[in-house]
Amino acid sequence: MGSADDRRFEVLRAIVADFVATKEPIGSKTLVERHNLGVSSATVRNDMAVLEAEGYITQPHTSSGRVPTEKGYREFVDRIDNVKPLSSSERRAILNFLESGVDLDDVLRRAVRLLAQLTRQVAIVQYPTLSTSSVRHLEVVALTPARLLLVVITDTGRVDQRIVELGDAIDEHELSKLRDMLGQAMEGKPLAQASIAVSDLASHLNGSDRLGDAVGRAATVLVETLVEHTEERLLLGGTANLTRNTADFGGSLRSVLEALEEQVVVLRLLAAQQEAGKVTVRIGHETEAEQMAGASVVSTAYGSSGKVYGGMGVVGPTRMDYPGTIANVAAVALYIGEVLGSR
């Protein structure tokens, strides 16, 4: 890339930085005064004319300065050389706050609240999906001799409870054997494999006695409820942050809020996050969702030991502090994974 192209990118970078900070269209005189561009105002005007002709900036009003377009923001984001890492005190504060969570729900609620505060955008965190989880522990509790409570705890800390109605009452000895058999079949296995194992166990016993019947009924509940009908859940925080930037959405705020409420679009975007530590930025129409055309989504995956638990990120206007947002999303995702992986 030639020096003229490099210089024009520095002009674009300055326009993005100033517009994000001030919300005001930026003129050539302002750029020369605020930034050490090393060229005259006339040269900056010429560079801005080229940037506008190529679609990187636009003039919103006849006598105003220029503002970045989606293409301009994309060029800016693609050429971020390095993201300034958070300070050690900031990282420690994030980790301490998340570690104080008493369980999975509390950790994720804290994460979404923290990310919304750090970025001043809407924060979104996807619950760990059962399809990517393994069974850490299975507990069987007798509510009555003929009514059981199954408690499945995954390696991500997710807890699911289901009731099983038995055909015949079982005694303490049979309950203990049932607990051992189901645990041996499922614990330590991914959910899909655990469901196959518990189904095979039920088929082998084939309801031959009271214990076999109990295993069959428990297996049916575990397979049908916990595996085949997994629920995608999403936590949102900081929705009010969007309403403070209504003008940035150019009349599209309502559709963005509707997309967040419906969750389908956001879940699709988060589902595309398959690699923890890699942050993806989608600007405006890059979200491929008409409702989100006025917004940007900065997202990543969180997980532990190379395993992805779910996606997370922020939604905000295209006029966004991209370097700061990327750094905060990456940091919170890293520490969610650390906290959940250590439990």
From Swiss-Prot:
Superkingdom of origin organism: Bacteria
Q: Which Pfam families match?
A: HrcA
Gene Ontology biological process terms, A to Z: negative regulation of DNA-templated transcription
Provide this UniProt record's keywords sorted from A to Z. Answer: Repressor, Stress response, Transcription, Transcription regulation
One function term, GO molecular function aspect: DNA binding
Q: Which SUPFAM superfamilies match?
A: GAF domain-like, Winged helix' DNA-binding domain
Known function? Negative regulator of class I heat shock genes (grpE-dnaK-dnaJ and groELS operons). Prevents heat-shock induction of these operons.
**What family does the database annotate?**
Belongs to the HrcA family.
Q: Which PANTHER family match?
A: HEAT-INDUCIBLE TRANSCRIPTION REPRESSOR HRCA
Q: What is this protein called?
A: Heat-inducible transcription repressor HrcA
Organism equals Mycolicibacterium smegmatis (strain ATCC 700084 / mc(2)155)
